[in-house]
A protein has these predicted regions:
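Terminal accessory/anchoring regions of large secretory-pathway or extracellular enzymes
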Residues: 1-127
Length: 127
């Protein structure tokens, strides 16, 4: 698994960052890679195909491969950043299940033109 950390310019900076022990690798398989920043509660996920990932009381399901960044805003709202690195220019459906609540969003990449696959941002309301 790997992480993207803005502002880290040297190996020494990265080593110092990792020693804070805020990062946990939750999955590193041929189907999905998931890392979570425990301090900020930001999740980064790479799905190589349709699939799902469950950790404790949260499940994320996607119907196509994609890259996700998930930030829980409050108990009923999640900020989702999604990209289609394969540039398939199609729709990707993301469903998030949490205790007694869930939310689904259809992310449309069909009119992306030269920016095919670029990151889009959505707010998901859990009901």
């Amino acid at each position: 698994a790997y992480i993207v950390v803005p502002g880290i310019r040297t190996a020494e900076n990265m080593k110092s960052y990792l020693q804070k022990n805020n990062i946990e690798i939750l999955a590193n398989t041929e189907n999905v890679q998931v890392v979570r920043n425990k301090k900020t509660d930001i999740w980064q996920m790479i799905f190589y195909n349709a699939g799902e990932f469950t950790h404790k009381d949260m499940t994320v399901k996607v119907d196509k491969g994609c890259a996700l960044i998930i930030k829980k805003i409050d108990k009923d709202k999640i900020k989702l950043h999604i990209a289609d690195p394969a540039q398939t220019q199609s729709n990707i459906t993301v469903k998030i299940d949490a205790p007694k609540r869930s939310g689904t969003i259809n992310c449309d990449f069909s009119n992306s033109d030269i920016y095919a696959g670029r990151t889009q941002t959505f707010d998901i309301r859990l009901k």
